């Protein structure tokens, strides 16, 4: 074991963490690579902001490395690439120099173009606005606002480095545009327009991941993710509240998950299709490889259609969330085997229609607006949904796949 090998292991872990991988996946991948390099004495402490690792050389001396992990920027293609590289390493058909070179290539992997990111912001806002109950006109307006937000988000980071300030200004922009469309009678329902546009910046994934890390006893990481999601939602709520309080007095009607339109099969089908399209948008924003877009779209459609169908058959929202999340988690696991990539590629995108980020944001917004009863209701809904989704994922993760017996008869 040399210092170079340990640094390679840490670099693989750093790429995974900074790309949005969970702690357990990062630890497992590092251990797989370590065993493939023929040493069993790696001791590593992994958190979402750093990796501390110690190993022994052949002469018995210890080497220690500390690796700082930058802010998470979700890139599922990088996670998939590191996963594929780790499989090649375990097969022992690659040199140390080749591993180091490939990790450098993965770390500097190119992003989707400015055009495709704008397409993603537009489709995400329009698709999810329609999925949660807007009219076609309002969903188009949400898409236009999403497009403008995309231009803002893709350019503002060249000027500002504060995520809090970027989010506040972005939410002010969304609220201003939404209210202007309503003022000129181009739209009818401000709530669904704003919620659709907000979906592009809502922290639904960190919120659920925080609960997942809690469930795996990674309390420090869970607290960090939860506080990050809370701060993002506060920033969003502050921006919208400022616009609503100082400039406009448009009444926003609370939209609860239990009140979605499930009366018509055609309506549920069309809204689920738009949820699938919105899922594709997040596949672009999360840098999923293009060959997985169809899978993500289909799973996004299925997750929302299952939820709407189950909600139409019974009144327990959490049961609908659990069954939908459980089925999608199983489907993601099956696809991961067939496509030879991590399940997170499908799971993180296809569950997006079910994520509670919007409810979390609304709980803070209504608290700021002095409507405590509504705020508590949305806070309760967001935490229950997050726990329900996390439980469904954890259950599927701990289900052992059946062993397939090979026919040994000649």
Residue ranges of each PLM-predicted region?
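Short juxtamembrane and helix-loop transition motifs at transmembrane-helix boundaries
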Residues: 97-109, 122-134, 149-161, 250-263, ...
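Soluble N-terminal domains of membrane-associated systems
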Residues: 1-101, 105-107
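C-terminal transmembrane helix-loop-helix hairpin of multi-pass membrane proteins
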Residues: 18, 193-201, 209-234, 308-410
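Membrane-interface helix termini and inter-helical loops of multi-pass transporters
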Residues: 184-190, 247-265, 366-378
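Alpha-helical membrane-inserting segments
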Residues: 127-132, 148-157, 173, 177-185, ...
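Structural signature of hydrophobic alpha-helical transmembrane segments
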Residues: 129-145, 189-203, 258-274, 312-326, ...
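Hydrophobic alpha-helical transmembrane segments
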Residues: 115-119, 139-144, 165-169, 226, ...
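Core alpha-helical transmembrane segments of integral membrane proteins
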Residues: 111-208, 284-286, 290-295
């Amino acid at each position: 074991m040399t210092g170079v090998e340990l640094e390679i292991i840490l670099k693989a872990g750093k790429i995974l963490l900074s790309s949005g991988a969970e702690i357990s996946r990062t630890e497992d991948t590092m251990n797989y690579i370590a065993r493939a390099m023929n040493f069993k004495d790696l001791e590593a402490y992994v958190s979402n902001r750093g990796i501390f690792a110690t190993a022994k050389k052949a002469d018995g001396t210890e080497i220690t490395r500390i690796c700082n992990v930058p802010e998470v920027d979700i890139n599922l293609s990088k996670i998939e690439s590191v996963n594929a590289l780790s499989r090649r390493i375990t097969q022992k058909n690659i040199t140390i120099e080749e591993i180091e070179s490939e990790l450098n290539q993965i770390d500097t992997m190119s992003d989707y173009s400015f055009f495709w990111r704008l397409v993603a912001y537009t489709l995400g806002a329009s698709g999810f606005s329609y999925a949660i109950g807007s009219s076609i006109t309002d969903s188009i307006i949400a898409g236009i606002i999403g497009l403008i937000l995309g231009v803002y988000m893709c350019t503002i980071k060249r000027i500002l480095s504060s995520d809090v300030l970027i989010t506040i200004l972005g939410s002010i922009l969304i609220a201003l545009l939404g209210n202007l469309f309503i003022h000129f009678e181009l739209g009818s329902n401000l709530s669904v327009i704003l919620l659709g546009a907000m979906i592009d910046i809502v922290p639904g994934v960190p919120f659920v991941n925080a609960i997942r890390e809690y469930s795996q006893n990674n309390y420090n990481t869970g607290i960090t993710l939860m506080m990050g999601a809370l701060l993002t939602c506060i920033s969003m709520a502050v921006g919208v509240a400022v616009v609503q309080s100082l400039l406009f007095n448009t009444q926003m009607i609370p939209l609860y998950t239990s009140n979605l339109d499930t009366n018509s099969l055609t309506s549920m089908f069309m809204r689920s299709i738009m949820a699938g399209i919105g899922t594709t948008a997040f596949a672009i924003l999360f840098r999923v490889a293009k060959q997985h877009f169809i899978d993500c779209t289909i799973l996004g459609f299925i997750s929302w259609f299952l939820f709407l169908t189950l909600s139409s058959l019974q009144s327990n929202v959490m049961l609908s969330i659990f069954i939908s999340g459980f089925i999608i988690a199983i489907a993601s696991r099956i696809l991961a085997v067939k496509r030879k990539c991590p399940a997170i590629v499908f799971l993180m995108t296809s569950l997006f229609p079910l994520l509670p980020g919007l409810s979390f944001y609304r709980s803070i917004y209504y608290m700021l607006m002095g409507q405590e009863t509504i705020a508590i209701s949305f806070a309760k809904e967001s935490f229950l949904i997050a726990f329900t989704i996390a439980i469904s994922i954890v259950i599927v993760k701990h289900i052992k796949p059946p062993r397939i017996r090979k026919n040994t008869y000649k």
